[in-house]
């Protein structure tokens, strides 16, 4: 159950009261609840732009200029998460704002962090469940192979082969071998031509708590 904070003096106390529904007309001591509707949002993104008050830039001669983002796709990244129970594929675009340096009050660190790690926009997200596989079937080779083929079809349909593609793989489930087979096969013939880099993002364990005993049949 979602909870809301209670305001007492100048300190946020422990969450105690349940929050109302998002379309409720109730208020919190005169302050109305506000929720942003993202159901119609096309892209999932981590890009944040200046607010409307900071979007007006003042030049040295006294004239003002409205800041307008000018985004350009640098490359695409195809992420693959291959667990023992499922396969998740995400295709995202790395975008660069050509007018980012025009932000008001931008520090040197802000500029360096932005260009060192450019933001990404998720374009396509698929898993084996999206193709109708259920329960234990989601972790099988065939499910991952069909999901990979469907991902390559969507990339081609949406005309996202105009930039280089980087492939990032994570974990070592059955879907990893299926994804590679589909990529180098006829299913990924149009995509593999644009792949310029393949990397592994599997996390390595150093110490930590003891892992569960491996299941053997």
Curated annotation (Swiss-Prot):
Keyword flag Ribonucleoprotein: yes
Keyword hit for Mitochondrion: yes
A Gene Ontology BP annotation from the UniProt entry: mitochondrial translation
Gene3D superfamilies referenced in this protein's UniProt entry, alphabetically: Ribosomal protein S11
Record GO cellular component, one term: mitochondrial inner membrane
Subcellular location: Mitochondrion
GO molecular function, one term: structural constituent of ribosome
Additional comment: Present with 5300 molecules/cell in log phase SD medium.
Protein name as catalogued: Small ribosomal subunit protein uS11m
Native species: Saccharomyces cerevisiae (strain ATCC 204508 / S288c) (Baker's yeast)
GN (gene name): MRPS18
């Amino acid at each position: 159950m979602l909870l809301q904070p209670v305001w007492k003096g100048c300190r946020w106390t422990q969450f105690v009261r349940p929050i109302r529904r998002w379309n409720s007309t109730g208020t919190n001591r005169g302050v109305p609840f506000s929720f942003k509707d993202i159901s119609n949002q096309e892209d999932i993104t981590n890009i944040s732009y200046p607010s409307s008050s900071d979007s007006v830039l003042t030049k040295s001669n006294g004239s003002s200029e409205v800041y307008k983002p000018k985004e350009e796709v640098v490359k695409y990244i195809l992420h693959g998460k291959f667990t023992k129970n499922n396969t998740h594929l995400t295709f995202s675009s790395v975008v660069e704002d050509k007018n980012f340096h025009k932000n008001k009050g931008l520090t040197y660190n802000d500029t360096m962090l932005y260009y060192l790690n450019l933001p990404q926009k998720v374009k396509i997200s698929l898993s084996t469940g999206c193709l109708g596989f259920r329960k234990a079937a989601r972790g099988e080779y065939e499910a991952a192979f069909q999901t990979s083929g469907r991902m390559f079809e969507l990339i081609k349909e949406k005309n996202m082969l105009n930039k280089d593609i980087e492939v990032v793989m994570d974990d070592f489930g059955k879907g990893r071998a299926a994804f590679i087979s589909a990529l180098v096969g006829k299913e990924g013939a149009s995509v593999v031509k644009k792949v310029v880099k393949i990397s592994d993002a599997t996390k390595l364990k150093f110490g930590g708590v003891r892992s569960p005993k491996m299941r053997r049949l």
